UniProtKB/Swiss-Prot annotation:
This is tRNA(Met) cytidine acetate ligase. GO terms for molecular function: ATP binding; ligase activity, forming carbon-nitrogen bonds; tRNA binding. SUPFAM superfamilies: Nucleotidylyl transferase. It comes from Lactobacillus johnsonii (strain CNCM I-12250 / La1 / NCC 533). Catalyzes the formation of N(4)-acetylcytidine (ac(4)C) at the wobble position of elongator tRNA(Met), using acetate and ATP as substrates. First activates an acetate ion to form acetyladenylate (Ac-AMP) and then transfers the acetyl group to tRNA to form ac(4)C34.
Length: 385
């Protein structure tokens, strides 16, 4: 049996994701497809536009057999930690094949992963404080392996390859060339596949009429988007962030995960004059940090996620089962006794008291307040026949 894995955010699920799923299904035939998906917060430091249950439902409708939540501790992180957490989780769940979308599928990603893992860890490549870590990393990779990886999906793909090659049994990698718009294209394009960024932007600017999105979404997804009472975004959250920064002491801010190099002082200083979240980011931006890094820091601050909480969560890693098909249920029965990561089907006070699930429940409290629906307690995995 070949078990196929996909790492995803599905923010939201669109035609490009459906294309990748179809390619995976052609390869899998009757074998299971497992998706590890970010929860209600995504890698670049934002709330997802739809909750994790609706996005899992879309994946199942498109052909996934099992959808698991990637814990917050891994999901809202730079590419290397995001990849390490998701790839190890897929491996622990028995996945042997990884499908992912990239701008250039002709590269030998396994080879790139091997080469990058051979680079000494004590190098001085990342000491230039006039450039972001991401820029320095990409320059180092290009210098060492001869390929630039500065496009979003390429960077993640290389991170997947590096993480895979660190496993005892590396995954077989299957890069699939992306179709349609670029990853970060902000506007809808006259193509069948538009970027998730463009779709989110359209939802925020035209919440009362989403009919234009129909051609970019799989069947049924437009109805799901239209049923949303609110589309979570940083504009909604900025007043909460402002209160949090203004009311917290410097000592409290210093305990926040990834708060470093005096950023707490800069945030305290600039929050008073910032008109909105975008202007606040510009005011605290420096050459040292990417906007994604600062958005993540703002999210950690808003949710009061501390350095110790992240460290403690890594001592007790589990994953929440969001949904399954009949094929997925049968596969779970076969592996459940031997699986390397605890699988949670029902959240209760005991399993939510600590670890990655405990932190997930904590951070989801705000998301619940925004959308008005419970996200953990009282929920059960979605079943599709």
């Amino acid at each position: 049996m070949s078990v196929i894995g996909i790492v995803a955010e599905y923010n939201p699920f669109h035609s490009g994701h459906e294309f990748l799923m179809n390619q995976a299904r052609l390869a899998a035939k009757n074998d299971p497809i497992i998706v590890v998906m970010s929860g209600n917060y995504v890698q670049r430091g934002q709330m997802a536009i739809m909750d994790k249950w609706q996005r899992a439902k879309a994946a199942l409708a498109s052909g996934a057999d099992l959808v698991f939540e990637l814990p917050f501790s891994f999901a809202v992180q730079p590419a290397d930690i995001f990849a390490n957490g998701s790839i190890k989780m897929l491996s622990d769940l028995g996945v042997s094949e990884l499908f992912f979308g990239v701008e250039d599928a002709n590269l030998n990603f396994s080879y790139l992963g091997q080469k990058i893992n051979q680079i000494p860890k004590n190098r001085m490549d990342f000491r230039d404080y006039t450039q972001t870590y991401a820029t320095q990393y990409n320059e180092m990779v290009a210098r060492e392996v001869g390929h630039e990886v500065n496009q979003p999906n390429m960077m993640l793909a290389v991170a997947y390859a590096v993480a895979s090659e660190q496993l005892k049994n590396p995954l077989h990698l299957h890069p699939i060339t992306r179709v349609g718009s670029g990853h970060d294209d902000p506007l809808l394009q006259d193509k069948i596949v538009s970027s998730a960024t463009a779709i989110r932007n359209y939802c925020l600017h035209h919440p009362n009429d989403l009919s234009e999105l129909k051609k970019y979404l799989p069947k049924g997804e437009l109805v799901s988007l239209e049923s949303q009472k609110v589309y979570p975004n940083w504009n909604l959250l900025f007043s909460f962030l402002k209160y949090r920064i203004e009311s917290a002491s410097l000592e409290e801010l210093q305990s926040i995960y990834q708060m470093s190099e005096g950023l707490e002082y800069k945030m305290k200083e600039e929050i008073h004059t910032a008109e909105d979240f975008t202007s606040f980011l510009r005011q605290i931006k420096s050459k040292r940090y990417t906007y994604a890094r600062l958005r993540r820091l703002c999210l950690y601050t808003l949710l009061n996620v501390t350095e110790n909480e992240i460290k403690d969560s890594y001592q007790d890693v589990s994953t929440l089962l969001l949904g399954y098909s009949s094929r997925g249920r049968n596969y779970l029965k076969k592996i459940r006794k031997d699986v390397q990561v605890p699988i949670i089907s029902k959240v209760d006070k005991k399993n939510a008291a600590s670890g990655t699930l405990g932190l997930q429940v904590k951070v989801d409290r705000l998301f619940e307040q925004i959308i008005g629906e419970d996200q953990n307690f009282g929920r059960k995995p979605i079943e599709v026949k």
